[in-house]
């Protein structure tokens, strides 16, 4: 499974970085 950071990195354009 992908970790939270991996998902955020993969969807960096969609998910804003906190």
UniProtKB/Swiss-Prot annotation:
InterPro entries membership: Pyrokinin_CS
Record keyword Secreted present: yes
Superkingdom of source: Eukaryota
Localisation: Secreted
A Gene Ontology molecular function term of the record: neuropeptide hormone activity
Positions where Leucine amide occurs in the chain: 18
One annotated Gene Ontology cellular component of this protein: extracellular region
Signal peptide: none
Sorted UniProt keywords: Amidation, Hormone, Neuropeptide, Secreted
GO biological process, one term: neuropeptide signaling pathway
Biological role: Hormone that controls sex pheromone production in larvae.
Family, similarity comment: Belongs to the pyrokinin family.
Record's protein name: Pheromonotropin
Upper classification of the organism: Eukaryota, Metazoa, Ecdysozoa, Arthropoda, Hexapoda
């Amino acid at each position: 499974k992908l970790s939270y950071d991996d998902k955020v990195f993969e969807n960096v354009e969609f998910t804003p970085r906190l």
